[in-house]
């Protein structure tokens, strides 16, 4: 028994980018997720919230997966949202930050 200190048993969960910035326009961005075990994404929107961004796919297995982040056009308030990506006991966040519409008079 190596008391669970075997490095091969550690969860690896990495994003090519952890914080995406978007202008107020609708846009689709992609992020690479690399994992060595099954993973899933919690969109973290409650039923009463407007889900202004989404990530697909929401689950997968070991390897590198391209996540597609769809961001809808924004109004007059800057907004930010965290998606939780979980594999085993490991959790990482993907943060989406979107600028508000700016009027030039």
Predicted regions and their residues:
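Surface-exposed binding patches on compact interaction domains or structured appendages
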Residues: 10-15, 36-66
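Bacterial Sec-dependent N-terminal signal peptides
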Residues: 1-16, 101-104
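A short beta-strand micro-motif common to beta-rich folds, especially ectodomain repeats
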Residues: 67-69, 77-89
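Interdomain boundary/hinge segments at the C-termini of tandem beta-sandwich modules
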Residues: 94-102
């Amino acid at each position: 028994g190596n008391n669970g200190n075997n490095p091969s048993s550690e969860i690896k969960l990495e994003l090519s980018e952890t914080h995406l910035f978007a202008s107020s326009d609708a846009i689709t961005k992609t992020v690479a997720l690399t994992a060595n075990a099954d993973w899933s994404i919690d969109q973290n929107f409650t039923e009463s919230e407007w889900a202004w961004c989404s990530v697909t796919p929401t689950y997968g297995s070991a390897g590198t997966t391209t996540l597609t982040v769809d961001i809808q056009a924004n109004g007059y308030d800057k907004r930010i949202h965290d998606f939780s990506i979980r594999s085993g006991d490991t959790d990482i966040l993907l943060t989406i930050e979107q600028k508000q519409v700016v009027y030039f008079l």
